[in-house]
Curated annotation (Swiss-Prot):
<dbReference type="InterPro" id="IPR003526">
    <property type="entry name" value="MECDP_synthase"/>
</dbReference>
<dbReference type="Pfam" id="PF02542">
    <property type="entry name" value="YgbB"/>
</dbReference>
<feature type="binding site">
    <location>
        <begin position="34"/>
        <end position="35"/>
    </location>
    <ligand>
        <name>4-CDP-2-C-methyl-D-erythritol 2-phosphate</name>
    </ligand>
</feature>
<feature type="binding site">
    <location>
        <begin position="132"/>
        <end position="135"/>
    </location>
    <ligand>
        <name>4-CDP-2-C-methyl-D-erythritol 2-phosphate</name>
    </ligand>
</feature>
<feature type="binding site">
    <location>
        <begin position="61"/>
        <end position="65"/>
    </location>
    <ligand>
        <name>4-CDP-2-C-methyl-D-erythritol 2-phosphate</name>
    </ligand>
</feature>
<comment type="similarity">
    <text>Belongs to the IspF family.</text>
</comment>
<dbReference type="InterPro" id="IPR036571">
    <property type="entry name" value="MECDP_synthase_sf"/>
</dbReference>
<dbReference type="GO" id="GO:0016114">
    <property type="term" value="P:terpenoid biosynthetic process"/>
</dbReference>
<feature type="binding site">
    <location>
        <position position="42"/>
    </location>
    <ligand>
        <name>a divalent metal cation</name>
    </ligand>
</feature>
<dbReference type="GO" id="GO:0046872">
    <property type="term" value="F:metal ion binding"/>
</dbReference>
<feature type="binding site">
    <location>
        <position position="142"/>
    </location>
    <ligand>
        <name>4-CDP-2-C-methyl-D-erythritol 2-phosphate</name>
    </ligand>
</feature>
<dbReference type="GO" id="GO:0019288">
    <property type="term" value="P:isopentenyl diphosphate biosynthetic process, methylerythritol 4-phosphate pathway"/>
</dbReference>
<comment type="subunit">
    <text>Homotrimer.</text>
</comment>
<keyword id="KW-0414">Isoprene biosynthesis</keyword>
<feature type="binding site">
    <location>
        <position position="10"/>
    </location>
    <ligand>
        <name>a divalent metal cation</name>
    </ligand>
</feature>
<comment type="function">
    <text>Involved in the biosynthesis of isopentenyl diphosphate (IPP) and dimethylallyl diphosphate (DMAPP), two major building blocks of isoprenoid compounds. Catalyzes the conversion of 4-diphosphocytidyl-2-C-methyl-D-erythritol 2-phosphate (CDP-ME2P) to 2-C-methyl-D-erythritol 2,4-cyclodiphosphate (ME-CPP) with a corresponding release of cytidine 5-monophosphate (CMP).</text>
</comment>
<dbReference type="InterPro" id="IPR020555">
    <property type="entry name" value="MECDP_synthase_CS"/>
</dbReference>
């Protein structure tokens, strides 16, 4: 049994939507990133890679590589699942916390969970996503960006 932690953050930029957990959410900003900026899937990918002692997404999908420019983070997450599987591990469960003042996440969380469960090839009850604010404190409270913490439990395949 292995446990991994992932953390990622992206700052806001010009745009009119963000993508979190594979879900396109209307917003007054976009997220600045080399890929699609899905900070939730990036943190989950890091948690999975960390649990398997396989580094992080920067190692596997460097932002200096043009092939990952604008990449769909769901495709990257599925690739991470394949890497972890090849090392003899399967996902036990994942849990993530989105830290954002806005937009409101509650209307989108179930769809995020469904997308993530499909990409991880697990049941819905093995995926938890929740959201909180920092009560207008820090960079997320000032609506400068979004952060996500994620943990993953891996079991022998």
């Amino acid at each position: 049994m292995r446990i991994g932690h992932g953390y990622d953050v992206h700052r806001f930029c010009d745009g009119d939507f963000i993508t979190l957990g594979g879900v396109r959410i209307p917003h007054k900003y976009g997220l600045l990133a080399h890929s699609d900026g899905d900070v939730l899937l990036h943190a989950l990918s890091d948690a999975l890679l960390g649990a398997a002692a396989l580094g992080d997404i920067g190692k596997h999908f460097p932002d200096t590589d043009p092939q990952f420019k604008g990449a769909d983070s769901r495709v990257l997450l599925r690739h991470v699942v394949g890497i972890v599987d090849n090392k003899g591990w399967k996902v036990g469960n994942v849990d993530a916390t989105i830290v954002a003042q806005a937009p409101k996440m509650a209307p989108h969380i179930e769809t995020m969970r469904q997308q993530i469960a499909a990409d991880l090839q697990v049941e819905l009850d093995q995926v938890n996503v929740k959201a909180t604010t920092e009560e207008k404190l820090g960079f997320t409270g000032r609506e400068e960006g979004i952060a996500v913490h994620a943990v993953a439990l891996l079991l022998p395949a």
